[in-house]
Amino acid sequence: MVLVSCSSHKKSSTEMEIVKNELEKIRIIDQYCATNGRPPDKFKDYPIEKWNNFKDSVYQKNQQKIEAYLDKYGYLGFNEIGEHSSNILRLVAQHSDKNINFQKRILTELKVQVDKKNAKASNYAYLYDRVKINSNQMQYYATQVEYNKLGQAIPKKLEDSINIDARRIEYSLMPLKKYLNLLTKNHFEMNKDYFLKRGITEPKLYK
């Protein structure tokens, strides 16, 4: 009898196409939830608590699907499913804040693939910071932010801020000021009506 481990499961091209299609469905619903802090028109009758509960249920279902893929195939990188689809694994982990053990599992397996050039270094940096913040520790790459009353993105607690841009460049991340301004612009556009009512007519960018 020959025993085959989960990680050595043969990855046929047809099977990987099915996985890629399923991952794309996961990405679409993940982003729908992640980009709507308040109930969108389709869910306009939902109070905010019910909408948040719905989002949590979506994230949990997505997480379970990704875990099933990990158990069956191991971490799927560029070589297996291409860059776009592989990025979705980290995306799902990023939004699984209520299951830090799952985030840590993805982080560990992602690092192995990054070292093999089979996954994006920036994905590792984003998830590393997320796990640190969720563990009440300092982040290292300044990917995780909050917003002040003016709508400006501000890094959450950060270790060694002096050398931050050097670390970000090493992990294929844009310079911090450019990143914060990008997030500030996006935040303003997503909440434009709110800011206009407060007399803020444009995003407050860092100079």
Regions found by a protein language model. Give the residues of each.
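Bacterial Sec-dependent N-terminal signal peptides
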Residues: M1-M16, K207
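Short acidic, Pro/Gly- and aromatic-enriched capping/linker segments at domain boundaries
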Residues: G151-R167
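Alpha-helical solenoid repeat scaffolds
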Residues: N123-K132, E159, F195, I200, ...
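Short secondary-structure boundary/hinge segments and terminal tails
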Residues: C6-S8, I88, N186
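A cross-kingdom marker for long, charged
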Residues: N163-K207
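N-terminal helix-rich structural modules
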Residues: K10-S135, A142
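General secondary-structure edge motif
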Residues: Y46, R90, Y147-N148, E159
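Polybasic, proline/glycine-rich intrinsically disordered low-complexity segments
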Residues: Y140, E146-L150
